Structures are given as C-alpha cells and as structure tokens.
Amino acid sequence: MSVKPTLSKPIGGQDASSPAVVMRRLWPYVKPLVWVLVAGVLAMAAVAATEAGIPALLKPLLDHGFGSKGDMTTKLYVPAAVVGLALARAIAQYASGYLLQYVSNRILLDLRIQMFERMIHTGVSFFQRETASTVINAVVFEVNQVLSVLMGVTITLVRDSLTVVFLLGYLFYLNWRLTLIVAILLPCIGWLVGKINRRLRRLNREHQTLTNQLAYIVEETVGGYKVVKVHNGEPYEIGRFNELSRKLRGYSMRMTVSGGLAQPLTQFLASIALAVVLTIAVVQSANDQTTVGGFVAFVTAMLLIISPLKHLMDVNQPLQRGMTAAELIFGLIDEPREPEGGGKPLARASGAIEFSHVSFSYGMSRDGRQTLDDVSFTVAPGEMVALAGPSGSGKTTLVNLLPRFFDPSSGSVRVDGVALPEYSLRDLRNQIAMVSQDVVLFNDTIAANVAYGQAPERDRVEAALRAANLWETVTAMPDGIDTLVGDNGMRLSGGQRQRLAIARAIYKDAPILILDEATSALDSESERHVQAALETLMKGRTTLVIAHRLSTIERADRILVLEGGKIVESGSHRELLEQGGLYAHLHRIQFQQDAG
C-alpha cells in the first residue's frame, strides 16, 4: 500500500496553497534584496516600453520620410532613433536579466542552506518517515521550481503586462475604433491557444511520467543485471521496455498533433483580424481618416501584442508547478527540530546508565502492545551488558533511547544519575560512540572517516587504526590515510569497512559504547581482526551490545533477554543456561547453526 508523502502539505494551514501565501513565506528572503528587485523590474519596464517604440517610429518614416519630397530630418532621425532604441533595449534587457538572476540565486542559496540545516537537525522519526529521494528532490530540485515561480511569473507579469499596456495605449492613440475591433478578436485567439495549451500540458505530464518509468526500467535492469542474467529475465525486461517505448512514441505523436495545431490556427484567426482591420482601414483611408504610416504602425503594434498575451495566458502552468514545489520546500523548513535538552553541561560521564520503568511505542499496534513495556535496569560504569532476544523484541529501540533518537513514552533514562532531557543534547551525544551492523562511511578520506565530526589529528588517526587492526592495510594503500574510500566505503572489503567504523568509535574515545554486532558473514581472517578490534574498543567503556556472536555473549558481564518489549531474563551466560528459559533456547538454536 502506498503512503502519501507527509513532507508536502499546504502552507499556512490552508486547504491549498495560494500564490499570496507563498509570496508571504518568500518575503523574508526577498526583503534584503528588495531594491535590487525593484531595479530589475524597472529595467523590465524599460524593455516593455521599447516594444511600442518600433511601430511608433514607423509612422513618421512612412508618412514623411519616403519619396523625393520626403522630409530630410525625418529620414535622418528615424534610423538614428532605431539604433538608439535598440541600444537602450539591449542595456535594459541585460540589466534586468542580471539583477533578477542575482536575486534568484541569492534566494536559492538561502533556501537551500536553511533546508539542509533544518533537515540535519530534525528528529530520527523524520528520516524514518520520509524517503531519501523525497528529501533530495526537495533540497536539490524543487527549490528551482519555486524560484521559477518567483522569477518566471514576475518577469511575465511585469514585462508582458507592461508590453500589452504600452501597445494597447499606442493602438488607442493611433485609432481607437480599430483597437476596439482588435480587443474583441484577440480574446478569441487567446481562448483557442489556452485550450490547446491545456491539452499539451496534460500530454506533457503523462509523457514525463512515462519517461520516468522508462528510466526506472533501465535503472533496475542495470542495477540488477546479475539477477536478470541468472534468471534469464532478458525477454521480460525487453518486453516491458518495448511496450513502454511504444506508449511513449504514441504520446509524442499526440503532442506533435496538438502542438502543430496551435500556430496555424492562431495565424488563421490573426489573419481574420488582419482582414477586418484592412477592410476598415481601406474605408477610412478613402475618407482620409488614416495614413499609410498610421496603418502600418497599427498593424505592426497589433501583431506585436499577440506574443505577450500568449505568455500571460500560459502563466498558470509554472505557477501551479511552483505551488506544489513550495509546499515541499516549506514543509521541510517547518519540520520541528530535535529538542535541544535542558542545557546541563556534561564534560565526561562516568558511564553509569539507568532505565527506570521505560515504555515506548512507535504507534500503538492493533493489540495495543508497546515496543518497550516497563523496562528497568542499571549498568555500572565500565560494565558490559549484552542484549539478547528474538527479532522484534525491542533491542534496537532500547539502545536508540540512550542518544535520544527517541524519548520514552513514560519512565526515564538517566546517565550518571541525571535524566537525559536535562543534559545539553550535544554534550550527551559526545559521551556515546555507536558501531552499527549497518556500517556507514562517507565518500571522503580514511582520516576524515575516522575523525568524523572532529578535526583529524594524524597521530590519533594512526593510533585508532592500529587499535582497530587496520593500520597495515591502510599503509599499503597508495595515499595511506588520505585514500578516498568511495561511496559508503565501496573500495574496501566488508571486514575493512567494519574495522574502519570501529576505528571511528575508538577515535571518539567516548565513555559509553553502543554496539550492534554485524551479522554479515566474514571470512575467518576478517572475523579474527574484527573481533580483536572490538575487544580493544570495549575495554574500559560502559557497553550496551546487541549481541549476535556467541563469543561476545559469553564474555558479557550480564545478559538481558528481551521478549515482546519486556526483560524476561537477566544474568550471566552460565546462570541463564542453567535456568533453561528463552536464552537457553536461543543459545541452543544458534549453537546448532554455528556447528552446522
């Protein structure tokens, strides 16, 4: 069942976002640049004014400059005025383009930075709720859509509206009777073009959807090429690719048919308008009511007005696309931040941990059962406690409460006798190192990965790598600790990736360690190196470990056995085996698997 993304939501608590609401949200970003924006708009107004200048120069030239008896002054000043007008237009056009792009790029920078900062400071529940592609799309791509509304619609409304106003004003000045006729016919042209454009927009959306589906098929086939080949899936993949390609071709042809109608029909209706104007103009000229120059200037201005009118009619499409993008962007910006905590400083904890009647639920299940239910235990400084139990018993949820990825629904978690919310969140997390079975490495150097979150000190990096039994491997690499590990450490083996994650925890030197042991199979040599690195890491630290290896469980000072969100057994390895309960059952199953 598909789940509707929660990141995109109407802005300002409305049922649907409106341009006015979006502009109010954008105003704080625009305000520091308002005078730059005003200058850009004025430059656009100058560009619009020059549109009416061209037909205005044709009239005196045709009326007074042509023929042997033409006025010499008119013959000289009109060409000079054309050059001057073109120069003024070019300068104004460049100025408006530069100034508006300056505003656009500055707002883009501010929005992206704020979005990334908010994303990185949201709670863990946000990352569990939203897909990575949704967040990436919002931060990287959708910002451009909002700025397309801000700049594109602004340019269209200002430049083309002013162009229409100037040209209509000039038309009324030349001949108000003919202008009234044009004013009646032009909306008909606009209605027809708008209807064709609506169909084109729908076809474009469907075409884009099919294009994305086609790209996804290629991506799936390339990424899963081994499965495709082993299962002889080539005919299936070729079949669905060909089917979608044929659909795509059909939509392309329908777009060609619809798009091809727009220009001929527009030209046909414009020709009707022109024929009506010509007829009336001939009648008026017979009665000496118009001149050749006035007629040519009128027709030129009439033809020039069609393009900006079309742009104004098409403004709704980018506007609606921008509204959708704005909902995604401000949905991210409005996400609540993680709680900062009470601000109590914590330089270095002794490592004492206490869970007191802790309950937690991600959302009540149908039977009303919670993920953790009234869990209580203490861990002494330097003690190693292993968490065991079947899948879904609450082990990972329990350790996630310690760095405050989540807060308990009831009860409290304490470090050194102080409830976690009282500590500064940054100071609290400085006390905790975490090594997960899902190793996360960044596309950076080995040194940067080891010292992640801190400035790399080469001596400390070397010491951490030695302690993790990885130093000899690193020194054999061409660039040593400056070697790039690739996307999530793809240039390293599985065992090397795990040891690099352990080296990162050693470098942090936190008094509390959370260890989720890897279940992935390693060769015996890698297993030996990883086990030795873990022993070094756990030495002298308070350790909570979600144990998968028998050797780790047996070495723990105490084992807590969870089932259904409750601690059902507690004791040492030997004590729990003697009890013959759930732990003994799990141990027997794993021992048989290991023996097998």
From Swiss-Prot:
Superkingdom field: Bacteria
Enzyme class: translocase
UniProt main location, coarse: membrane
Residues binding ATP: G389, P390, S391, G392, S393, G394, K395, T396
Gene3D superfamilies registered for this protein in UniProt: ABC transporter type 1, transmembrane domain, P-loop containing nucleotide triphosphate hydrolases
Record-annotated ABC transporter domain positions: 353-589
Cross-referenced PROSITE patterns: ABC_TM1F, ABC_TRANSPORTER_1, ABC_TRANSPORTER_2, MSBA
Subcellular location: Cell inner membrane
Record GO terms (molecular function): ABC-type oligopeptide transporter activity; ATP binding; ATP hydrolysis activity; ATPase-coupled lipid transmembrane transporter activity
Keywords from the named record: ATP-binding, Cell inner membrane, Cell membrane, Lipid transport, Membrane, Nucleotide-binding, Translocase, Transmembrane, Transmembrane helix, Transport
This enzyme's EC code(s): 7.5.2.6
CDD domains, per database record: ABC_6TM_MsbA_like
Topology in membrane: Multi-pass membrane protein
A Pfam family recorded for this sequence: ABC_membrane
InterPro entries recorded: AAA+_ATPase, ABC1_TM_dom, ABC1_TM_sf, ABC_transporter-like_ATP-bd, ABC_transporter-like_CS, ABC_transpr_lipidA, P-loop_NTPase, Type_1_exporter
GO cellular component, one term: plasma membrane
Domain ABC transmembrane type-1: 38-321
Transmembrane segments: 34-54, 80-100, 138-158, 164-184, 263-283, 292-312
Reaction catalyzed: ATP + H2O + lipid A-core oligosaccharideSide 1 = ADP + phosphate + lipid A-core oligosaccharideSide 2
Role, per record: Involved in lipopolysaccharide (LPS) biosynthesis. Translocates lipid A-core from the inner to the outer leaflet of the inner membrane. Transmembrane domains (TMD) form a pore in the inner membrane and the ATP-binding domain (NBD) is responsible for energy generation.
Similarity annotation: Belongs to the ABC transporter superfamily. Lipid exporter (TC 3.A.1.106) family.
Quaternary structure and interacting proteins, as annotated: Homodimer.
Domain commentary: In MsbA the ATP-binding domain (NBD) and the transmembrane domain (TMD) are fused.
NCBIfam families in the record: MsbA_lipidA
Name this polypeptide is given: ATP-dependent lipid A-core flippase
